[in-house]
């Protein structure tokens, strides 16, 4: 299988990993729409929402709440959109949840290493 997210899970492709456990990996989006834009992906390959186990979905939502709190504490976000694409609009055919932060005053996109440092340190 030639899945970019499976390669990220296996560390064949580097990522700015914010959180990882036996079920999921959470990392910064390489092409962010805003500062702190991240993805949560299951380590097991599921193609889309129809394919994924409910227990894994529940775990992803649990981790999304933890990441929201982290984004609020470290990047001082003012809002958060969760996005999960399927079918025609799904670019990578491996289930993933986008966490896209919003800010009262729009900011320029910071260097990914700067965002990573703010989220991983302190």
What are the language-model segments listed below?
Residues 1-122:
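HIT superfamily nucleotide-processing domains
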């Amino acid at each position: 299988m030639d899945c970019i997210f499976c390669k990220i899970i296996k560390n064949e492709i580097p990522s700015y990993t914010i959180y990882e456990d036996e079920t999921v990996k959470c990392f910064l989006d390489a092409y962010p729409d805003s500062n702190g834009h991240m993805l949560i992906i299951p380590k097991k390959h599921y193609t889309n929402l129809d394919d994924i186990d409910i227990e894994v979905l529940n775990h992803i939502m649990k981790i999304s709440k933890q990441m929201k709190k982290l984004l609020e504490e470290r990047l001082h976000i003012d809002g958060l959109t969760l996005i999960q694409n399927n079918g025609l609009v799904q670019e990578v055919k491996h289930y993933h949840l986008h966490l896209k932060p919003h800010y009262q005053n729009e900011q320029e996109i910071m260097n990914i290493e700067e965002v990573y440092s703010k989220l991983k340190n302190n």
